[in-house]
């Protein structure tokens, strides 16, 4: 188990004298990249009309949590590694430890809400606007912080410097069994539920793809028999919909029920909110009743083109959200496994520090993912970097 150094706040050890400079360099990169990237993200959400949606408030919440860590906490981690000594006193060590876990907890809870939202969009589109209404989204955001604070406030007396990772954290011995239960809820139950939601999204699209394949086979059979008017597929019954979880390009997943453009553009697209999905169902029924020729003409309208384009945007946004979750999880897995398998700290101290330092990645990686995987964020970032304050006038 970790040994607490709450007398002299030292994490000095001969085995890490050289490694500390690696940790300091990495910590500076995280602090600078995370601060700049997360500030740019908040500004992008503020100035880009197509990013100003209710659902994107979840992205903003995740960004605030990351900014709290990178801007306020990370510089003290760098200083502690550089001197191998916590130099700001016992009280701020408690504040640091408390805010560290609050930030991580808010991130996990927000990732859960994002995954839930993506799932509702594809599986229960009528339920989405009820859950993520104006009041619902505000309540969800406030709840992430209230729950996080309430979870870790009781540990206030036992936040100390943990020498093996040179970081202020809770004393695992004095915190038992509460801390074990708490970590299990957040990191095991919480992150597992996010993974389950994305699996459900993928399965939903896969089932719809199978239905579409059967539909295509029936259409091919009708064409081979030269049935009049059978050469046109009935629009509105099926739409291509990418789950966003494939490693390559968009998958061939198909939605067996129309998806409205407003629904699929909650993270990218115009700023309109999700509308009642009964219109989509009515459109489907009309398309099934109308002759194929009449329906084919209707496809040329602007609204239909937009509806056909929007599912691919759903896939891109879902893929981006999944990548954020994946990076967060992968950055924590080595640290969590090491603490489970090496509870008595028999592994070299530098190994524990390496695992702990890898968790820093989750504070700065998200803006990089947004820029790489989302056109709207990429354009907003580029405008901010090129034009500075003038960007605020450009997007209004």
Curated annotation (Swiss-Prot):
The keyword Phosphoprotein applies. Phosphorylated by a subset of GPR84-activating ligands. Constitutively phosphorylated at Ser-221 and Ser-224 in the absence of 2-HTP. By contrast, Thr-263 and Thr-264 are phosphorylated only following prior cell treatment with 2-HTP. Gene3D superfamilies: Rhodopsin 7-helix transmembrane proteins. Pfam families: 7tm_1. GO terms for molecular function: urotensin II receptor activity. Residues 243-310 are annotated as: Disordered. The modification Phosphothreonine is found at residues 263-264. GO terms for cellular component: plasma membrane. The modification Phosphoserine is found at residues 221, 224. It is found in: Cell membrane. The chain crosses the membrane at residues 27-47, 58-78, 95-115, 145-165, 181-201, 321-341, 353-373. GO terms for biological process: neuropeptide signaling pathway. Glycans are attached at residues 3, 8. InterPro entries: GPCR_Rhodpsn (IPR000276), GPCR_Rhodpsn_7TM (IPR017452). Keywords: Cell membrane, G-protein coupled receptor, Glycoprotein, Membrane, Phosphoprotein, Receptor, Transducer, Transmembrane, Transmembrane helix. Residues 1-26, 79-94, 166-180, 342-352 are extracellular. Residues 48-57, 116-144, 202-320, 374-396 are cytoplasmic. It is a multi-pass membrane protein. Interacts with ARRB2 and ARR3. Belongs to the G-protein coupled receptor 1 family. PANTHER family: G-PROTEIN COUPLED RECEPTOR, G-PROTEIN COUPLED RECEPTOR 84. G protein-coupled receptor that responds endogenously to dietary fatty acids or nutrient, specifically medium-chain free fatty acid (FFA) with carbon chain lengths of C9 to C14. Capric acid (C10:0), undecanoic acid (C11:0) and lauric acid (C12:0) are the most potent agonists. In immune cells, functions as a pro-inflammatory receptor via 6-OAU and promotes the expression of pro-inflammatory mediators such as TNFalpha, IL-6 and IL-12B as well as stimulating chemotactic responses through activation of signaling mediators AKT, ERK and NF-kappa-B. This is G-protein coupled receptor 84.
